[in-house]
Amino acid sequence: MPGIKLRKLRAKDIPQIIAIHGAITKKKAYHRWIQQMVKDHLRKQEGVGFVAEKEGQVVGFIIGEIKGEGFGLEKSGWLEVVMVHPRHMGMGIGYAMACKLFDYFRRRGIRDVHTSVLWDAVDMLSFFKSLGFDRSTFINLIKHVDQKSIHFSS
């Protein structure tokens, strides 16, 4: 990837990360969420993030975290979010950032990396497959909680 530099994510990258997020999702409503998520990850001892820069501009970012044992898992890495600006997709930037994240995990003794993806996000499923991800033993479940109280009898 000529002209692309990978480095640790910094707080000053947040405006460019928000711009990338907006270019992909087209939703301003999530700007505050992405800003807070990045700030939270920068504060976490086990959180890590990298950006890809081209000519001083952030063109991609990846955020991960090492999580402790739980749900029957060993201490493991989690790839929380990866995004590349649409103008720079297909150049191997996401792949390079993921490899850097995996190396970070590996150096810390992590053997397994987990992530979640929408089942119909074919492009992301293909991307994760190219990185060697496969189905896990988990499935994601959701329950919508409305205004009604849930009652149980004893």
Which sequence ranges carry the predicted segments?
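A short, internal acetyl-CoA/4′-phosphopantetheine-binding micro-motif in the GNAT/acyltransferase core
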Residues: 79-89, 117
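Conserved acetyl-CoA-binding loop-helix of GNAT-fold acetyltransferases
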Residues: 84, 90-103, 130
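Conserved GNAT acetyl-CoA-binding A-motif
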Residues: 105-117
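Terminal substrate-recognition subdomain of acyl/acetyltransferases
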Residues: 129-154
